[in-house]
């Protein structure tokens, strides 16, 4: 069976959907325990106080409070959640 394969443009035209990564809650925002703060591939952001990290490197709040981004050692950006009373100071 003689078949001629389709030309280029007919065989292209596929693209994967975006993964919806990035910062979900910004500095100063009020969050509750369990809220996702950042979805990421690898450790662009590191967990600080009041924050946990899932196996896919998702950073989430473990306490209620306000989000704070800050730089640490080795030029790492840490995300912390400060309890409301502490954040007001």
Swiss-Prot record:
One of its GO terms (biological process) is translation. InterPro entries: Ribosomal_bL27, Ribosomal_bL27_CS. Gene3D superfamilies: 2.40.50.100. Keywords: Ribonucleoprotein, Ribosomal protein. One of its GO terms (cellular component) is ribonucleoprotein complex. Residues 1-20 are annotated as: Disordered. GO terms for molecular function: structural constituent of ribosome. Signal peptide: none annotated. Coiled coil: none annotated. Belongs to the bacterial ribosomal protein bL27 family. HAMAP family: Ribosomal_bL27. This is Large ribosomal subunit protein bL27. It comes from Ruegeria pomeroyi (strain ATCC 700808 / DSM 15171 / DSS-3) (Silicibacter pomeroyi). The gene is rpmA.
């Amino acid at each position: 069976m003689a078949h001629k394969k389709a030309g280029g443009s007919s065989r292209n035209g596929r693209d994967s959907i975006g993964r919806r990564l990035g910062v979900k809650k910004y500095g100063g925002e009020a969050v509750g325990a369990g809220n996702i703060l950042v979805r990421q591939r690898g450790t662009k952001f590191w967990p600080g106080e009041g924050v946990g990290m899932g196996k896919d490197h998702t950073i989430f709040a473990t306490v209620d409070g306000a989000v704070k981004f800050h730089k640490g050692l080795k030029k790492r950006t840490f995300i912390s959640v400060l309890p409301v009373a502490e954040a007001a100071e």
